[in-house]
């Protein structure tokens, strides 16, 4: 699958049996999907688009989901996409995201992309956060030699490396 490819999602609704609340499912439950990190601006100002991550045939990629018609457009390709790192700019024209140790700005219409920052060698960059006026971005940089292996061998102990004491 490649950047710009279009998929379709069929929305469905059901009533939660415990609360009586109507729940609207936006994505196919057979495809692993999730939204961006909670403080990232993941919807456009007009509420038409939502940034999501999905795991399809070739791993996890970022997509825009049109909340009016269910169209899903793939916006990244390749390995190392920061699966919860994307955010819309304050004017909805740019999508910022992380891939490997690089941070990118992408034109939301044309998908033209340019790298604006790369973490130094020996460091890992993550958790980008943008100011509301898009003037400042914070990035967590951690020395790679202080991180546990990310190959799954540590299991849940991977997270213990970040606990105090």
Predicted regions mapped to residue ranges:
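Short, solvent-exposed coil/turn segments
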Residues: 19-21, 36, 153-156
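Short, contiguous, helix-prone interaction/anchoring segments in small proteins
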Residues: 27-54
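Blade-loop segments of beta-propeller domains
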Residues: 32-39, 59-103
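A short beta-strand motif characteristic of beta-propeller blades
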Residues: 24-32, 71-77, 112-118
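Short acidic/glycine-enriched loop/turn segments that link adjacent beta-strands
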Residues: 20, 58-59
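Asp-box/WD-like beta-propeller blade repeats and closely related beta-sheet repeat scaffolds
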Residues: 80-89, 93-165
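Blade/loop signatures of beta-propeller domains
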Residues: 1-24
């Amino acid at each position: 699958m490649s950047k710009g490819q279009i998929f379709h999602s069929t929305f469905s609704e059901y009533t939660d049996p415990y609360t009586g609340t109507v729940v609207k499912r936006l994505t196919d439950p057979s495809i692993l999907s999730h939204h961006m990190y909670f403080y990232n601006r993941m919807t456009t100002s007009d509420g038409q688009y939502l940034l999501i991550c999905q795991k399809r045939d070739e791993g996890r990629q970022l997509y825009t989901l049109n909340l009016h018609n269910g169209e899903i457009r793939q916006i990244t390709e390749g390995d190392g996409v920061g699966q919860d790192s994307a955010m819309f700019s304050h004017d909805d024209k740019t999508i910022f995201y992380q891939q490997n140790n690089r941070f990118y700005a992408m034109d939301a219409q044309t998908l033209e992309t340019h790298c604006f920052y790369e973490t130094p060698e020996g460091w890992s960059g993550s958790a980008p956060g943008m100011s509301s006026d898009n003037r400042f971005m914070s990035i967590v940089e951690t020395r790679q030699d202080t991180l546990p292996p990310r190959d799954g061998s540590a299991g849940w102990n991977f997270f213990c490396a970040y606990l105090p004491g």
